[in-house]
Amino acid sequence: MLARFPLYLRLVRMDKPIGSLLLLWPTLNALWIASDGHPRWPLIVIFALGTLLMRSAGCAMNDYADRDFDRHVKRTADRPLTSGKIRAWEAVAIAVGLSFVAFLLILPLNTLTKELSVVALFVAGTYPFMKRFFAIPQAYLGIAFGFGIPMAFAAVQNTVPPLAWVMLIANVFWSIAYDTEYAMVDRDDDIKIGIRTSALTFGRFDVAAVMACYAVTLGIYVWIGIALGFGAAYWVGWAAAAGCAVYHYTLIKGRERMPCFAAFRHNNWLGGVLFAGIAAHYLMAGS
């Protein structure tokens, strides 16, 4: 078992934390806004660990669902499950175990949060199979990656206000943007094996679609900033996020694999500076 532990870590992408961070930033945005800038530390820990666990569970389930496809893709052919180094039942067991631990984390929270966690689990568990049916499965991914938003509001306020759903919509568009960049890396392989992705659906308009999704995401956060009366610190963070989006355009406009992958990875900075702007606003407002 100990000898296989490094393989399990690779299965759940512990060596690639970018995915966890893409889940974490929107969740932290929601925690800070829901609590008016004063989230309780136990909640921060619960949601941070829950994000890590559920992303890891999602990776294991994704590899299980895609095990017959990944062997045909150069980038994924050496994954532990695809290469036969671990077995399918192990991936499923790990996904179930991590999901159970994540649920244990939220047991101290209110009933509404626990009810929403069931929905979140369903969405996360079914996403890997959506690539067979949906033309833009990245939209479904955005719901899965963003469900920490309504859960955060529920945990803090014991209700899910319209603002939470607006933030979730913003996350859906952001997810379409960054995961389309990711899909542009595997475009040729996905055509051969018949997987549906937004990069294939958008076709020659893929770059324009990515930038349009960034524009919608940032536009929603303009509305949020105005509606909540955020100050200059927030707008500095927003401007930095907009700058990241412009930088991504320079990377993806040539549609080359490595620059597109770099743009995907750089979304960590976009999410991070936007959260920094929100946190800085509340910090300065309370000083």
Swiss-Prot record:
Membrane topology term reads: Multi-pass membrane protein
Keyword field contains Transferase: yes
Name the needed cofactors: Mg(2+)
Location of the protein in the cell:
Cell inner membrane
The answer, when asked if Transmembrane is one of the entry's keywords, is yes
Q: In which pathway does this enzyme or protein participate? A: Cofactor biosynthesis; ubiquinone biosynthesis
**What keywords are annotated for this sequence in UniProt?**
Cell inner membrane, Cell membrane, Magnesium, Membrane, Transferase, Transmembrane, Transmembrane helix, Ubiquinone biosynthesis
Where is it mainly found?
A: membrane
- For this chain, the annotated S-S bridges are none
Membrane-crossing ranges are 41-61, 89-109, 133-153, 158-178, 218-238, 267-287
User: Which is one Gene Ontology cellular component term of this protein?
Assistant: plasma membrane
Instruction: From the UniProt record, list the reaction(s) this protein catalyses.
Output: all-trans-octaprenyl diphosphate + 4-hydroxybenzoate = 4-hydroxy-3-(all-trans-octaprenyl)benzoate + diphosphate
**GO MF terms on file?**
4-hydroxybenzoate polyprenyltransferase activity
Q: InterPro entries recorded for this chain?
A: HB_polyprenyltransferase-like, Prenyltransferase, UbiA_prenyltransferase, UbiA_prenylTrfase_CS, UbiA_sf
**A Pfam cross-reference name:** UbiA
Q: What is its EC number?
A: 2.5.1.39
Q: Which GO terms describe its biological process?
A: ubiquinone biosynthetic process
In which family does this protein belong, per the annotation? Belongs to the UbiA prenyltransferase family.
- Function statement: Catalyzes the prenylation of para-hydroxybenzoate (PHB) with an all-trans polyprenyl group. Mediates the second step in the final reaction sequence of ubiquinone-8 (UQ-8) biosynthesis, which is the condensation of the polyisoprenoid side chain with PHB, generating the first membrane-bound Q intermediate 3-octaprenyl-4-hydroxybenzoate.
Record's protein name:
4-hydroxybenzoate octaprenyltransferase
To which species is this protein native? Answer: Burkholderia multivorans (strain ATCC 17616 / 249)
* Gene that encodes the chain: ubiA
